[in-house]
Amino acid sequence: MIRSNSKCTPSWGDAVIHTAPLPTTTPSHASDHSRLKLFSGSANTALAQEIARYLGIDLGPMVRKRFADGELYVQIQESIRGCDVYLIQPCCRPVNDHLMELLIMVDACRRASARQVTAVIPYYGYARADRKTAGRESITAKLVANLITQAGASRVLAMDLHSAQIQGYFDIPVDHVYASPVLLDYLRSKNLEDIVVVSPDVGGVARARAFANKLDDAPLAIIDKRRQAHNVAEVMNVVGDVKGKTAVLVDDMIDTAGTILEGARVLRREGAKEVYACATHAVFSPPAIERLQGGDFEEVIVTNTIPVPENQRFPQLRVLSVASILGETIWRIHEDSSVSSMFR
């Protein structure tokens, strides 16, 4: 197997940006590369094809279909006995269908005597249901972890989990990787001046601080929401100096875009000269598109962990590819090499 080391010319338009591959590892021992098999579910075949190109292999043949009653069917079309299998499937909309498809793929591989089955989940659905906030609720993120484990997965590879503690919901190894290298490279390419990294809420401070530290130790600001009394609107304050600066709002996902839009408006009110939104997962539930293209952002920067269809594209949107990060991680897992060293 040969990984591509050629650099792709970046395109900063609406199209997906193919970033240069990360530094590759040198295998410490010979291995049978024919034992690495890559398959894709139906959730994001474009990303899976990019990962396959990075690794220099083809996606494995697989039949997927839906019966008249709605049941899903999956069949692996080649022998995977004794192989290390990687199944690429983000649990994005429709979440339940894609999750069930992943479980069926994992089970099919286990029953086909695969040596190892790694569920590659660029976007982990139900991640926000990571704890009980009221009585008689499910901790659905834990339930999903149980389902994936019981289906027969040997390992999980996930990107930018909403809560890092989700790794502990699994009784199998979890490799948690980050989209920050491609996001940071893109921001650096723009040569922005007077950058301040902003967390849209208190819960995202650790994520924003880590991002700021890697962005040339940029200063950090926090948007703090407070409700003074019942039936009184929330008051939003900015902790930190943003006046005359280029504000980069950093979050793990953009869903309905309500939080990040409110953040942009309060930053403008406090004197920020430009506002960029930066997130890994483009969930984009209605009315996100209307909110994001309203002129409050210079750019909205996301990645392709979730496919963004043409009808959700707008002039300010930039979609970056994380295929090189996921591809390199798969290679390192297969070669028993360090994954964490990619993000130091």
Residue spans for each PLM region:
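PRPP-associated nucleotide enzymes
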Residues: 1-344
